[in-house]
Regions:
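Compact alpha-helical subdomains of small soluble proteins
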Residues: 55-115
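Alpha-solenoid helical-repeat scaffolds
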Residues: 20-30, 42-53, 77-80, 84
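Residue-level detector of alpha-helical secondary structure
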Residues: 27, 31, 38, 87, ...
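Sec-dependent signal peptide recognition
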Residues: 1-8
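Post-signal-peptide N-terminal segment of Sec-exported extracytoplasmic proteins
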Residues: 33-66
Length: 115
């Protein structure tokens, strides 16, 4: 009887859900960057070039997932597939990493990218 009780205690203790504090300001900033790119690519809304490039840089460096967008003399995606792959990667990253997305994490990611 004692063994079963101990096994149940260990089982229930190991099933605790992990809670985190989500920094809504940073999550909203991340989503705003995605929405800016989405506005330009899906809705053909004119966006400021610097804002577009800043959003690409932010998302790429914070997530560690490089963009397939062009940003030399012209900017944007060569095709819809590249755009969709980037969006899926960045949105997937956000869903998996909301707990670690803090101001210090973002600042660190951006400072190592632009020393």
């Amino acid at each position: 009887m004692g063994k079963y009780f101990l096994i149940l205690v260990v089982f229930f203790c190991s099933c605790r859900s992990v809670h985190c504090t989500i920094d809504e300001n940073i999550v909203n900033e991340f989503k705003q960057k995605i929405n800016l790119i989405r506005s330009a690519e899906e809705k053909n809304i004119e966006v400021n070039t610097d804002d577009y490039l800043s959003a690409l840089t932010f998302l790429s460096h914070v997530t560690g997932k490089s963009t397939r967008a062009e940003y030399s003399s012209t900017f944007g995606y060569r095709n819809d597939q590249y755009y969709k792959e980037d969006m899926k990667a960045w949105e997937g990253w956000l869903n998996k990493n909301k707990c670690k997305l803090t101001r210090s994490y973002v600042d660190s990611a951006l400072s190592t990218a632009n020393p």
